Amino acid sequence: MIFEEFKTKLKAAKTEETVKAIYARYFNIDYDTSDMHDLYTPQVLFEFKYDKNFQDLKALATILAQSLYYVRRLKYGNAEKTIPYFLCLADKNEASITETNKWSSYYSNDSYNWESP
């Protein structure tokens, strides 16, 4: 798939699952959601939404918090996966990438209620 086709398919996407599938196909990622998170590679953990406003810092922070919850599960849970170097937050219109280690003081912190949905 070329980049123009990737953009066209994303624009036509109707669900979060479709957005995820388009990214997986474009980046040639086989995915397994058995650990209850979106796409994962040892380099990148993806968190997808259908259509969020990434310019709204509260919306972006909410998606980031969900990603950090998944990173914490990777760190302390039973999944035999490494913590990826990057987090990619994406929807059908935009994406944001950040280094995972910049957030370690959050996902390693026990003072947060990590059990809340």
For each of these PLM feature ranges, what is it?
Residues M1-F86, A90-Y107:
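A short, conserved, highly charged catalytic patch centered on acidic carboxylates
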